[in-house]
Amino acid sequence: MLVALPIALAQGADGERVKTEVKRNLQGSLSWSADETQQALQIEEVSVTSQPAGAMFDFLVDAQGTMPAEKKAIFRGKTFGVLSLGFNTIEMMVAEEGHLVEKHVAGETAGVRRLLELCNPDRAYSLGELDSQLRAGKLDITAALPRWQREVLGQIETHWDKVVRRFATVIVVGGGAFLIRDALLAKFKDRLFLPDDPILAIARGCYKFALYKYGRE
């Protein structure tokens, strides 16, 4: 089993302790009932990574679990950034020549949830209701979106600053990527990589990484 944690948990001060607890809680025998049928699963090994790392492997590894030569060249010889614009958090990661650059790792609680809060100053709706409206295209974000967009770009400037100039590629995932795509394109230009499905990219990347590491057995 491969588990992708928010980067603040995976790489924070208590990261190793959190990873150990996750492994201890998930490894072993699990049983549950679904549709009145009892299910059981034996988990032999648990690997823990960060959510931006899952997005990275979605970019680097193909559906067969292989890292093509051109992607190996980027992974081993280039600098690139990963930006995840999720519901709760904005997460940033930088990899250089195959290694994580820890000083440019960041996680901020300013994800799409923050946009919804800006749309709801009098708290007339729950976040769940606003999220449903947003997904259905029924939420008016005209006034709030520019402010949230500035906040996101501000976080990028704060945590990445001039290192952006070294990036060969910037991988952007999460539902927020759809909302400020034009601003991201203006900032990163042809270095921007937006997956065909930014919302599922992290989960898909974890699956690809499992194939890459363990094969199909």
Regions found by a protein language model. Give the residues of each.
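Short beta-strand scaffold segments in enzyme catalytic cores
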Residues: I90-V94
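Nucleotide/phosphate-binding catalytic cleft detector across ATP-hydrolyzing
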Residues: M1-F80, E102-V112, L139-T169, G175-E217
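Short, glycine/acidic-enriched loop or turn micro-motifs at the edges of active sites
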Residues: G54, F87-N88
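A mobile "lid/hinge" subdomain adjacent to the ATP/sugar-phosphate binding pocket shared
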Residues: V112-W148
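Conserved catalytic-loop position in the HRD/HxD motif
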Residues: V82-G86
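Short acidic-glycine loop/turn motifs at beta-strand connectors
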Residues: E96-G98
